[in-house]
Every structure is written in C-alpha cells, then in structure tokens.
C-alpha cells in the first residue's frame, strides 16, 4: 500500500518503505542518522523539509517530488527514480548530491555539495536547474534530452561536465577549477561566462551550433567544435595555451586571445569583430568561404589567412618574429586591407590563386629582417589569374616582388633592396609613384609608368634595371621613368621598347642593349638624346640616333638578349658617362649638338648630308651648322700657329 505522514522525527533512522506511494505532508528529520525513503512501486512526495545528520536516500519506481528543502548535513543526498522524473527544491549535502531519473530532472532550488560532487543523470529525459549548482568537487550532468542550467554552475575543485546525448545544452555561468566540458547532440548556448581556472574549456556541438554570450576563459585550452556555426559574442581567452574554434558552418568572434596559438577553421565564413592575439605563437584562419577581421590581428610567430572566398581586414596585422601569409583560392577572391601589415622579423606573402583584386586604404606593408636573408625582410604578392593590385606603400628590407598574370598594378610607393614588378598580359598598366631600390629593379609590362626611382642611400655600386615586355618575346609598348636618382649611376641590362622616355637626375646612365621600334628619349642633367626606329625627325634633342630594327630582333635571340653585358655586334648601346656632355654609343649617329661628344668620335648623318650638298666642304660647316665654331675644332682638332708651321723640323741627335 501507501504511506502518508505528517512530521516524523527520530534521533537515529527515519526509514519509510511502501509498496506504492510515500507522501510526507510534514517534515522528516533524523538528528543523528539517515532518512531513507523507498517506494517500490510508486512515487515519493515530500511537502516539508527532509533533514538528516547523515544521508538522505530516496528510491522510487515512479516520480520523486521534494517540495521542501532536502539536507544531508554530513552525508549524501541521493534521489533515484527508476522509471519517472525527479523534481526538487533546494538540495544540500555535506558530501555528494546524486540525482538519477529515468525521465526528467528539475531542480527549482539550489543544489549544493559542500565536500563532494553533484551528479545529475536523466537517462531518457532532460535536466533543468533553476538555481545554482555548487560542488566542492565535480559537477556532472548527463541527459538524453536537453540540459538547461539557468543558475550558476560551480565545481570549486573539480570539473563541470554537461552532456546531452540527443538534445541541446543551455547554460548560465559555468565555473570549474578543472575542465569545463560541454557536449551536445545539437546546440550549445552559454548565456553566461564559461571559466576553467586551471584547465580547459571544451565545447562540442556534434549536430548543431555553439553560441557563447559571455566570456570564455581557460587556464589552458579553449576548444570549440561544432557541426554548425560558432558565435562567440564576448571575449575568448586561453591564459597559457591555445584557442581552437572549428565549425562546419561559419565562425563569428569578438576578441580572441591565447598565450599560444589561435586557430579558427570554418567550412564557411570567418568573421572576427574583435582582436585576434597570440602572445607566443601563431594566428591561423582557414575558411571555406570569406574571412573578415575587423580588429587587430597580432602574433608572436606566424599569421595565416586562407580563404576560399575573399579576405577583408579592417585593422592592423602584426607578426613579431614570424611570417604573414594571406591567400585566396576562389573564382573571385579579393583581398582588401584596411590597416597596416607588419612583419617585424619575417616575410609578407599575399597569394591570389585564381582571380581577385588586392587593394588597401592608404596603408603600409612592412617586412623587416636581416639583410640578405630569405626567411625575413621579404614581401611577395602574386595573382595567378585576373585581378588588379592597388596598394599605397610597401617596404621590405630585402626583396619586394609583385607578379600579376592578368591585371594592372598601381603603387604610391615601394621600397626594397631588389624590387620586381611583373605584369604578364599585354595592355595592362604598371604605375608607381615612387620606387626605391638598393641594387636591382625588374619591371615587366607593356605599359610602364615609374614617376620616380631612387637608390637606397646605403647602397653600393650601380643600380641595375631590367625592363621587359609583358611577354619576353614582345617589346614594352610604352615606358616612362620621370626621374632616376642614384648614388653612382644606373645600368639597364637591356631595353626593348616601342616608345619611352627616361630621365636620370643623378649618376651615370648606361643602357647595355637597346632596341627602339618607334622613338624614345633619354636624358641626364647635361644631354637629351633621341633614339629612333621609325623615320627620324628633329625634336630638339642634343643627340639623335637611329637603330635598324629590321635586323637582330631580340625575339629571335632571347638567350643572347637576356645575357648581361653589351653585344655591340648585334645591338646598340648607349652610355652617359660621369663627364658632362659625353656619351659612348655604337648607334647610327644622326645629329649632335655643338660641344657635345659621342665616342667613338665620328661625323653625324646630318654632317654627311650637308657636306654632300656643298662642294666647298671646308666652308659647309660654318655656313650651315655653327658659323662661329670651326669644323675641325669641334672634332678635337687644334690650330697650329702659322710661324710654328713654317719652322724647321726639330733635330734628333743619337749618341752612341
């Protein structure tokens, strides 16, 4: 049958057994021992308090409802429903609180274990705790259905483990001295803070998403794995280890900070609305979609962006002692920078593996390192498909390289020991406001406009420039270099172009191999030179040359053309020396201004033509070219005094 009681008080045991139900309308109290309730075939209901000096044990086949507080002062509080649910108010134990139910567990009051652990097990149902769950050691909750902890969950010296095998887990604050471990078959939602004082925070949503609305802080690792999205709407911090966020959907974060690595992987997009910081290791972002970082991204070692969509940065990217690498692999994988990018002792690499533009908002890219090193101080940007590059400023201790398969390149300023700018499709424009280099410049494209070139002040020797067309077997269509300032001089290994102009303000100026199809102008502070491939015209140049483009086309001799040094038997060379008004060239000299010199010295084509028009060749030069300068004087001849010319030859005496 049933047992129905009012108040029951005993110095030792209070022991109530019923074949069916137990209902206690009053208080049940054992001042020095246990309260033991057993309803073999029914339910247990206590409407008053249940107090025991030692243990409170309730076992029922049906439901257990404790509508008053349950206290086991020095022992355990054990509530077990083999076929039903358990519903409680406050439950307090000196040792463990252990609540098992076949169906649901609902705690409408606080659950407290002063010296032990709290275990909640809903084998076929859900768990809901309205109040706090506080244990000296572990807090463990296992449910087949949902777990909802509305009040704070605290495991002062142990771990907090919440596991839903088929449902969701929703929490408030969860704090543990050891691990905070939350597993859900579906979604995890933390409305409060998740804190592990001395271990890890581990979140796993096997079939759903993870959302944290409070902070997530761990002494060691913070690990979140979700089949769906991960949204961390407050700060995530690993004090001494890693933060690892892995989503089958998208990842959205605020600030993420780790002593070691920050590793975020998403099958779709990554959006970091706060800062991403690795104090002693790497920041690694890998997205099957796009990546957007709105805050600062800082790492002691490497920073890596890898996206199957586009990349957008709105804050700075900084690596103290590693490399920075951004890569897209998409039909349209643009990379847009909104902050400076600095590798304090490493390389910067930007790769667009398919198509996409690379642009910034007046930012600076800085790659610093040891001089001559390949592992630091280098900048490299590559677009393998179609896309334009438009960047403000680039500085590299060593090499600064940009390679674009099919697009335009626009730079305000670039500075590197070696600078290589390569556009490999005809019709694209390469435009640079200021280019600073130490030893060498490689410029490739069909339309090249370099406003100002300056050599690094600490550079030794001549600055070497290697210009080429978009294709090696095609000339540059248009080349314009507004000004070149060097420490000693500049040397072009070869130059094949249709049209162009180059001005050197400081230093010597050498072109080892030169082919001009139409017309190009070259000048220093003292002389302006025109070189014609088309029929020449007077244009006010101090010297003018013609090169025969019908012979020795560079396209037919690429190996020889690209070798260093002159090849005077095949191609023209042009050297402006350190001495004013002096050139060395083997070109067909058309015209030369008075008091300018070209070595080896020779008559110009204009001189020859004028001489043929005037039978009095001695007077021709005075009449037609320079009336006040004798022709022979112009060619380094000098006049002998008339008396000297009439004197007797000098005698030579040889003594034996």
Predicted regions and their residues:
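Long, low-complexity, polar and repeat-rich extracellular regions
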Residues: 1-656
């Amino acid at each position: 049958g049933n047992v129905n009681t009012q108040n029951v008080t005993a110095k030792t045991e209070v022991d109530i057994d019923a074949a069916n139900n137990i209902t206690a309308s009053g208080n049940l109290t054992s001042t020095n021992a246990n309260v033991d309730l057993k309803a073999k075939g029914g339910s247990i209901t206590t409407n008053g308090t249940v107090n025991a000096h030692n243990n409170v044990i309730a076992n029922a086949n049906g439901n257990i409802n404790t509508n008053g507080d349950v206290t086991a002062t020095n022992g355990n509080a054990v509530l077990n429903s083999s076929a039903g649910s358990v519903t409680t108010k406050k439950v307090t134990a000196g040792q463990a609180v252990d609540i098992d139910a076949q169906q649901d567990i609902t705690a409408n009051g606080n659950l407290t274990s002063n010296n032990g652990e709290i275990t909640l097990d809903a084998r076929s149902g859900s768990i809901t705790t309205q109040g706090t769950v506080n244990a000296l050691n572990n807090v463990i909750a296992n449910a087949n259905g949902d777990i909802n902890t509305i009040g704070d969950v605290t495991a002062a010296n142990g771990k907090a483990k919440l596991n839903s095998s088929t449902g969701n887990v929703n929490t408030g604050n969860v704090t543990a001295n050891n691990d905070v471990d939350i597993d859900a078959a579906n979604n995890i939602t933390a409305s409060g803070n998740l804190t592990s004082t001395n271990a890890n925070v581990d979140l796993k949503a096997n079939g759903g998403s993870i959302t944290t609305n409070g902070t997530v802080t761990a002494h060691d690792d913070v690990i979140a794995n979700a089949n769906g999205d991960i949204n961390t709407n407050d700060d995530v911090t690993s004090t001494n280890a890693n933060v690892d966020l892995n989503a089958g959907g998208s990842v959205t974060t605020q600030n993420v900070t780790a002593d070691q690595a920050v590793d975020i992987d998403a099958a779709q997009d990554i959006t970091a609305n706060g800062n991403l910081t690795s104090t002693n290791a790497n920041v690694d972002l890998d997205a099957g979609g796009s990546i957007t970082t709105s805050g600062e991204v800082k790492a002691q070692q490497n920073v890596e962006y890898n996206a199957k969509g586009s990349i957008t940065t709105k804050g700075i990217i900084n690596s103290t002692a590693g490399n920075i690498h951004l890569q897209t692999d998409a039909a349209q994988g643009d990379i847009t920078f909104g902050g400076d990018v600095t590798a304090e002792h490493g390389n910067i690499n930007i790769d667009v593996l398919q198509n996409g533009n690379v642009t910034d908002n007046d930012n600076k890219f800085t790659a610093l390192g040891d001089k001559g090193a390949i592992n630091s101080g280098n900048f490299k940007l590559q677009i393998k498909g179609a896309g334009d590059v438009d960047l403000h400023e680039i500085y590299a201790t060593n090499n600064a390289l940009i390679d674009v398969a099919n697009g335009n390149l626009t730079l305000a300023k670039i500075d590197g020991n070696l600078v290589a700018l390569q556009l490999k499709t005809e019709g694209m424009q390469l435009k640079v406001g200021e280019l600073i280099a130490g030893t060498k410049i490689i410029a490739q494209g069909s339309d090249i406009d370099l406003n100002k070139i300056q050599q690094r002040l600490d550079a030794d020797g001549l600055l070497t420039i290697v210009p080429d067309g978009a294709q090696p077997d095609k000339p540059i269509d248009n080349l314009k270099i507004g000004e070149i300032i060097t420490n000693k001089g500049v040397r072009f290994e070869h130059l094949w172009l249709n049209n162009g102009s180059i001005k050197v303000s400081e230093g010597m100026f050498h072109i080892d191999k030169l082919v001009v199809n139409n017309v190009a102008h070259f000048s220093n502070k003292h002389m302006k030179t025109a070189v014609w491939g088309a029929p020449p015209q007077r244009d006010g140049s101090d010297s003018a040359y013609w090169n025969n483009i019908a012979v020795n086309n560079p396209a037919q001799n690429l190996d020889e053309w690209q070798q260093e040094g002159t090849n005077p038997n095949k191609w023209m060379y042009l050297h402006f020396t350190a001495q004013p008004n002096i050139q060395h060239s083997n070109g067909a000299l058309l015209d030369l201004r008075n008091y300018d010199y070209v070595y080896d010295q020779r008559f110009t084509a204009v001189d020859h033509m004028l001489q043929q028009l005037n039978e009095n060749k001695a007077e021709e030069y005075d009449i037609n070219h320079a009336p006040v300068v004798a022709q022979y004087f112009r060619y380094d001849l000098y006049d002998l005094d008339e008396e000297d010319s009439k004197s007797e030859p000098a005698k030579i005496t040889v003594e034996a």
